Amino acid sequence: MSPMPRVAVLGASSSPVVGIEYERHPEWSALAALPAYDIVLLDLPAVRAGEALRSLRMDKRYRFSLIYCCQEQDASCKALSDGAPPADLSALVPLWRLWQERFALFNRGVAPERFESRVLAWLWLHPHGAIHAVRDAGVAQHYHYPLLEALEDDESPNAFAWLQLMTQQGWLEEGELVDRVRLCVGCGSGRLNYVDVCPECQTLEIARQPSLHCFTCGHVGAQEHFLKDGLLLCPNCFSRLRHIGSDYDRPLENYRCRSCQAFFVDAEVEARCLDCGQAHAPDKLRVREVRHFRLAEAGRLRC
């Protein structure tokens, strides 16, 4: 075991890093041609730190390394880093030695080859770490797990199905519930558009239409059907409607379908998938809970 860790600081900040010896580099790409460092400190804004973290975690040399974010962190930083460094940077030395001891215990110090072993190893080596769900508008299901993506190599497991399987086997346990999303039954996408349609013919061609309710006979119809020679007359019982509240009233919203001419009070709601085009009733959509996950006791024993 090396007596002292080699530390790299990424970022062009001129602010000094006190308490530990280090080498500063402006970009993470500068590390590619150099021997691997033991600890990396990212002195970068959150967005750039997140990009650097994704690249570092996909590099097998830095997959399990201690990497800290010195500036403000976003969700990707929290998912892939060891958080903020200790205020006294000299405390990094015992943390690194503990990391070395744990790595030597896992699989006798040999880097794990299988995807599930890599994930368990990462969680084992980062005791306060978790598999964080991160919201991403570019993902069809609205959330993804950056840590799993960084560790997958040539494997491409379905993250949600894999997490459910690992939880059922007892290696992982559910953490905080982050969100609940609704997905298309056909393709599993969460890119859904909720539209009001005619309950008779399911067309979008509907419009609000003023209507009247005759108190004499109870007839409800479009206001235009009650107008005759400038007077309000019920088209059903021919009563003259003079006073709103005593002769007639205006119901809440009514709609007219421009395709089939149906007249109705409540439109039907459809969830239309923007990816595959299928339409479903909202209560038929798949509901998925989005959670963070952490290493379970059985997972620790497996390590």
Task: Give the ranges of each region predicted by the language model.
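Cys/His-rich short segments
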Residues: 168-295
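A short, well-structured beta->alpha microelement
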Residues: 1-58, 87-91
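Short, well-ordered alpha-helix to beta-strand connector turns
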Residues: 36-39, 64, 80-84
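A generic structural signal for alpha->beta connector loops
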Residues: 19, 63-64
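Short, charge-rich binding segments
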Residues: 57-62, 189
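Regulatory and interdomain segments flanking nucleotide-handling catalytic cores
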Residues: 5-6, 49, 72-92, 96-98, ...
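N-terminal alpha-helical interaction blocks
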Residues: 73-182, 186-196
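A short, hydrophobic beta-strand element within the central beta-sheet of small alpha/beta folds
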Residues: 41-42, 64-75
